[in-house]
């Protein structure tokens, strides 16, 4: 929320740095050097690097040194202020092996969102996916929210089966995006229930018959609202 932050961070600008742009080219080392030098001249700037573990093991042109090493001096002197994001697995596999790099950071564990929070995330992400794909989930917000709840509830089974590696909201977002992809491959400009069915089925954690049964229950529960929208209820193939 606005102003809901520590006073020490107020007034800072945050810039997201694309990890592939740093390590996916032959001049990644030069880009990092230019970035570090630029940060020395600026006050109250924080850079954010997602998938920061990818810098570990990405060699510089001078040898096997990780590109991550190029940030160490700036981090130690305070001229570089950096927030990095990664998963617990990647943190333990890559980041922890470089103790000097670890000492320059404070680890903050982000708790997995609840199912209710996950539904909110899906609802906020929907408009972006619609713009990106040109496909619409063409229902009222009430039905959209309940479709998101349905996806979250169904992916809870996926979470149970693959508990170690699967987390909210990623698994639910993946299913939502796959529903839009299924619509695109179906040459449809709108996401239908059959596309949601295909997306959930692709997880291979829920039997197709179970998905069909739950979709039938969903449609029955909201049949009046769907009828008002003129929705033609089709059976998944």
Language-model features: where?
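AAA+ P-loop NTPase nucleotide-binding core of proteostasis motors
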Residues: 1-237
């Amino acid at each position: 929320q606005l102003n809901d932050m520590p006073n020490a961070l107020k007034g800072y600008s945050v810039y997201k740095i694309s990890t592939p742009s740093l390590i996916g080219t032959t001049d990644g080392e030069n880009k990092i050097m230019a970035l570090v030098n630029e940060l020395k001249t600026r006050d109250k700037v924080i850079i954010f690097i997602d998938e920061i573990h990818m810098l570990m093991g990405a060699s510089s042109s001078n040898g096997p040194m990780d590109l991550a090493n190029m940030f160490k001096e700036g981090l130690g002197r305070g001229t570089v202020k950096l927030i990095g994001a990664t998963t617990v697995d990647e943190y333990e596999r890559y980041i922890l092996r470089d103790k000097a790099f670890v000492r320059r950071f404070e680890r903050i564990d982000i708790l997995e969102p609840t199912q209710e929070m996950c539904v909110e995330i899906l609802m906020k992400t929907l408009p972006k996916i619609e713009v990106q794909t040109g496909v619409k989930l063409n229902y009222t917000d009430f039905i959209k929210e309940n479709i998101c709840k349905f996806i979250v509830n169904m992916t809870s089974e996926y979470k149970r089966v693959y508990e170690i590696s699967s987390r909210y909201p990623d698994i639910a977002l993946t299913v939502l995006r796959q529903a839009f992809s299924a619509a695109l491959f179906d040459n449809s400009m709108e996401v239908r229930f059959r596309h949601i069915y295909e997306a959930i089925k692709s997880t291979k954690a829920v039997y197709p018959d179970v998905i069909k049964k739950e979709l039938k229950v969903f449609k029955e529960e909201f049949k009046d609202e769907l009828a008002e929208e003129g929705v033609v209820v089709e059976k998944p193939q």
